[in-house]
Amino acid sequence: MKSDIWRQTPASVKLLYITSFIMNLGFYALIPYLTLHLTGSIGWTLAMAGLVLGVRQFSQQGFAFLGGMVADKFGYKSTMILGMSIRAIGFALFAFCTKEWHFFVAAILSGLGGSLFEPAGSAAYAVLTPDAIRKEVFAFRNVLQNVGVVGSQIVGTALASLDFYWLSLFAGALYATTAVVAFLFLPPIAATNTKQGIWSSFSHVLHDQFFLKYTIVLIGYYYLYMQTFLTIPQLVEDIMHNKTYVGIVLSTISLSVILLQMKIVEWLQSYKQRLILIGIGAMVMGIGLFLLMFANHLWLLMLDAFIFSLGTMISMPQIVDMVPRFAPKEHVAAYYGFNGYSLAIGGTVSQLFGGWIYDVGKNLDMQWLPWTLCLLVGMVVVWNLYRMEGKLEQQLSPSRVK
């Protein structure tokens, strides 16, 4: 981040950076090893372990709209602290689970915590950040997330080698720490929807037809994005016959974002057609995934992963910056929460249908099938966003966050 932008960044946003980094460190240190714990130490099937992860994701994304409406009504700071505290309890509970239902309770609590602090946190970033530097602020948050991913691999490996018990307590303690830090140092962020009931946000979002279409189109983007959690690791293992290389390929994506995200935002600063940029990013992601069908060496896998990461770096800052442009300031968290359905649906379809189509292609000796589908999805996303771009200005809320 440039020094002048850093100077313009409010102290409260810098504190949000700290809490975001700590939470990402805790999340990515625990979740990948939860699957290994369930299938290894506990002896569950992969399908059963996947069900626990699916319950956690649905508990978060499925209730994020409600969490956003609560944040708009009762304040962003208090909602964030409540969500962080609930997730801290959920993550710590994994250390004490001995029966199946214990794990599902811990997963639900973990997800519900996220459904509160995620939309409230995104709205806090948008409200506290001057409009002129909001894209850069969200881009730097994306960088910190990937720094957290890389750091969590080191921390998670070290603690998991001791015992999953300590890893769960560590992850829970990190979220508890962020709750305390936010309580002590984050300034009050007043509720923006003080004159209307919670359900006014519900009605307002559902009547915003352009935003609903935008959210639906983003399902395709997240279908592509979530390939990093299933089909890409599986392809790397199938080609290299060693799980170690999975970490190398995924780290290529994270390190690329860390090194290049801010520079790409700077290069695209003068390009004002934001929806088209999101579409171009999705198209680049689709191309990177499509090229995987030609990869037969580690360096080709890493090159395709780098191309894929370029697409995420083009799209992601624009995606998180678009929501406050649609939303009236009194409903911004509700808009963020509803927009999360694109991730919930796209991620679920990606992991279920994407995994199935990968197996079908493999069994029919049509390895090109899942990757060609990804290219087509990228084309559909860019075409729809290109058509929507011309109508964007008249759809932006006149009372949006400035």
Residue ranges of model-derived segments:
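Conserved MFS/SLC helix-loop-helix module at the cytosolic interface between two early adjacent transmembrane helices
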Residues: 61-98
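A late C-terminal transmembrane helix in Major Facilitator Superfamily
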Residues: 331-362
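Cytoplasmic helix-loop-helix junction between adjacent transmembrane helices
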Residues: 107-145
